[in-house]
Design a protein with these regions (language model features):
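N-terminal amphipathic, basic helical "cap/leader" segment at the start of enzyme domains
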Residues: 1-104
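A glycine-rich helix N-cap at a beta->alpha junction
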Residues: 96-105, 163-182
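Acidic, glycine-rich active-site loops and adjacent beta-strand->loop/helix elements
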Residues: 82, 112-113, 153-157
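A short coil-to-beta-strand element that immediately follows conserved catalytic motifs
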Residues: 72, 145-149, 173
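Short secondary-structure boundary segments
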Residues: 110, 152, 181
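Helix-adjacent hinge/juxtasegments
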Residues: 94-125
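Small-aliphatic-rich amphipathic alpha-helix that forms the alpha element of a beta-alpha
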Residues: 62, 106, 119-162
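Residue-level "edge-of-site" marker
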Residues: 75, 153, 179
Length: 182
């Protein structure tokens, strides 16, 4: 049994508890105005300041990202080197001409081994990625980190160099979060 199946079985056990008549949810008051400010103020930023940013809380938040059956297939690679950021600025179609100016480029990948059913392999990785992207957007906004998502489009002739440099594990690339200061 792999780690994804173990996570799935834990998810099933939690779900069973929640369906029990004795289960009582522990909800907080969702009328908190700060929460709604984060929702309303979230934006995609493509121009960054030169201040340093602290991303440890953003990185730590990744463990809380929901995913299908709680398998947590998301992996990330964080790049802050000028040469690699410049290279990514040429490889990632949606980032041409601007992403190299950000403090960090967070490449997002999913491990296809997490998906057991053939029926879910074509679309579920992208649904999980979408949920992860929104989670990272909202967390970045709450932490006052400028952020923008870049779609996973890489020209066919550039895929080999991208994979050799940034995807040695052969995971499915699902996009990048570009992070910097306001």
């Amino acid at each position: 049994m792999d780690k994804y199946q173990e996570r799935y079985l834990k998810h099933q056990a939690r779900k069973k508890k929640m369906l029990s008549p004795s289960f009582k949810p522990k909800h907080k008051d969702h009328r908190n105005p700060k929460f709604w400010d984060v929702i309303k103020n979230r934006k995609s930023t493509r121009v960054f300041g030169d201040k340093d940013i602290k991303i440890d809380k953003l990185i730590n938040s990744i463990k809380y990202i929901p995913s299908s059956c709680d398998r947590k297939p998301l992996h990330f690679y964080l790049e802050d080197g000028a040469n690699n950021k410049a290279l990514l600025g040429g490889l990632l179609v949606g980032g041409v001409g601007w992403i190299h100016r950000a403090k960090y480029i967070m490449l997002l990948f999913v491990d296809m081994k997490a998906y057991k059913s053939p029926a879910e392999k074509d679309f579920m990785p992208y649904l999980d990625a979408g949920v992860a992207v929104e989670h990272l957007y909202l967390t970045a906004e709450a932490l006052n980190i400028a952020v923008c998502y870049v779609n996973p489009n890489i020209r066919e002739e550039n895929k080999e160099i991208f994979n050799k440099r940034f995807n040695k594990e052969g995971l499915l690339y699902v996009g990048a979060m570009i992070l910097g200061s306001y």
